[in-house]
């Protein structure tokens, strides 16, 4: 204890009453001494407040006498707000006296008052207008930042000028304990210094805030920011807050006045051009051939119409989340697609629904089921006997509600609970308009529909083995029902017209009259062909079998193992047929010639993306261990290679000859970009590698890891030889992004705890303590999500994980951002104002994991995480069109077109924009937007105008912190699925 020399034996102390009394006396003396110190402290504090008031009065008078924008008051008031977070400094200008509150090495540093001499201003540091003005009456104000410790990347040290009479005091870094012992109480100035280090800042803050009330009109725009993201400016830096943590970003020297910076919408926009991939992993019966020669299927929230002969795609873009099922109208033109529930950009739920749309014009005809379905739409079917007037739907609720709709009137006719077990299919009988059949786990139900009532009759298996799953339905020419089950058996159900014995059930019950062993493993899909023959697809055996009119096996063919098991079979042109597989392939084949791949994609979560430095190529890698090279002009796969580890990140060498791929285990591979041969393999740590980045000349490679280190390698022979150069150590969390300087001497990096650190690579990969030294570096690439040039892309109230990737275009005009809310954003570059506006686009149905521009900035590539999609966007520019130009749609209100889009750099004619739907319900109006033509962009019609940011309304106080809805399981009781379905988890 203080006040005692040495230590006392506990037994003697306890036994001696006199020692206890001595201790109490010493404690009383110390308490009295501390009370005296507090009294002196209060006096010093009063003096500090008096000096602050005088300084503010002087600044106010200077403001009135000079034609300025109130910069001194703005900086002064915001600096005070920085003190409240323990991370700022106060800078005053006074010809009589001034107070400097300077940062030390800890966040709770105190301030020194009044006697320090002015410091020399470092070369390149900018002077303020008010500084030069006050120089007429007082010494020139100068500032000198001091180095920062790596463990406190958000701290800023700044020395401020004092009066002419102040004595020189050196700025020396020392531990707080040493500094405390160095100070003395011999004079009033030193006494105040000591007291300012021990005083609680809360009372000072309250006084400072009161004194700053006069500046409320100046800082109102800053004050409206939420406490979770509050920008503050003092001289040379901007500070934003994320989850309560301050992030400091130094302003480049070429910014003369931060208040003059304006961030607007970029003239460039995005138009969806191509979608790579297909969702077959956890869906069924979702591939069909239309009379237009197009294959219709879906992935993410996009329904794709692909003409495999002309190699063109069109896209229906009306859905707001995962599309889960698809049905084609008997006229083969109209299509119904169902989606799951989702959330909008503000976290509000988007209800599951069915959209009926025209496959020729891509216009939405009707939106059905808003507020009716729960979780999602599992399966649906158009009626056939009455030419498709009605639509039946099974939702994903626990009761799996069956509803029948007059879809043209959007009216629900009948509704009933089916079962708590999984329902896999629903179909109208093709000749009996009043019969609906559902099947699923251990059941098949025959429903009689009459008016607004539905009556259920359960199929009885009797002497036949009851299957675990009845997986699919089809109808024979005589009206019999054909089912395929998990045992590989086809059952024929015939409707008996014999009057049953009393009490044995009603007339017209479906009974089994024949059983056929069709496949080893499950019968996954049935397809009735136009000529009356039947195609079946097996699960485990991967066979496509053709059956004649009497259900005798005629021909068969096996799908190669690398494509996976069969999920969908559809009739194609002539003798062709289409097959969708569990590994997300769509194959076109015949029994004579075998199979040809038409569509393919990744089959597990996708993160890695890199674009070629000078060719129209892009590379992706995913958790499925596939590395794929795509041609962005011909829209096809160049090559694919299976590696030993799940891939997570990638980057091309500037020569374009090799590409580096980082994996989840710390290993990284270098592959030849032409031959896909393995060039090199290395290991750095045993955790996930999050970023690979070559320097601009390709002589160095930086590898960012989840073990908090950045590993540096020298690169020789155009990327074919690597040797360890060094390691950057200093981050307190995993590396997320990094960028190189043009001279290869510096790296900027971000980490999982929102650090922005800079590294001196030339001098041994050392951490640069004085981060302001790097504020003027023009980075070769910009992929870091935190930095002065890009911090405006962050939403208010962000938890720091909302943005997964960011990339600046090569021409430095725009920034593309991938977020956790299924959106791709396009911002202007630089983006240095909070809540900057952006163009926003929807097509993904999962978190968008990565974005990258092609080498000539003609296209942007985005990747979806769990939706496994790769989407190629074309950059276009807006051009005005006549105000009286309108587009007519059966369900769209005539609206003057405000703009059109033409491709940049081509000179194609203007394209008509998409138009909003008319509707009575607000929810339906919001969700009813759909594309009119394929050329339309994906911007949501019912979202706020682009003059407002995606992240909120014009009210800066809005905080958006809701999380997206949790993913829904496709089935309950997945553990009981057939063998070929086990382990398959639904994507949404």
From Swiss-Prot:
The modification Phosphoserine is found at residues 7, 13, 16, 61, 79, 134, 144, 146, 171, 200, 906, 908, 914. Residues 106-194, 887-988 are annotated as: Disordered. The modification Phosphothreonine is found at residues 96, 201, 248, 620. Residues 1-260 are annotated as: Microtubule-binding. It holds the Pfam family HELP. Residues 137-155 have a biased composition (Low complexity). It comes from the Eukaryota. GO terms for cellular component: cytoplasm; microtubule; microtubule cytoskeleton; microtubule organizing center; midbody; mitotic spindle. Residues 156-168, 890-904, 927-939 have a biased composition (Polar residues). Gene3D superfamilies: YVTN repeat-like/Quinoprotein amine dehydrogenase. WD repeats lie at residues 270-308, 312-359, 367-407, 414-449, 456-495, 511-549, 554-590, 593-632, 636-673, 679-715, 722-761, 771-829, 836-875. Residues 14-63 form a coiled coil. Residues 114-134, 176-193 have a biased composition (Basic and acidic residues). Phosphorylated during mitosis. Phosphorylation at Ser-144 and Ser-146 promotes its dissociation from microtubules during mitosis which is required for efficient chromosome congression. Its main location: cytoplasm. Belongs to the WD repeat EMAP family. This is Echinoderm microtubule-associated protein-like 4. It comes from Mus musculus (Mouse). The gene is Eml4.
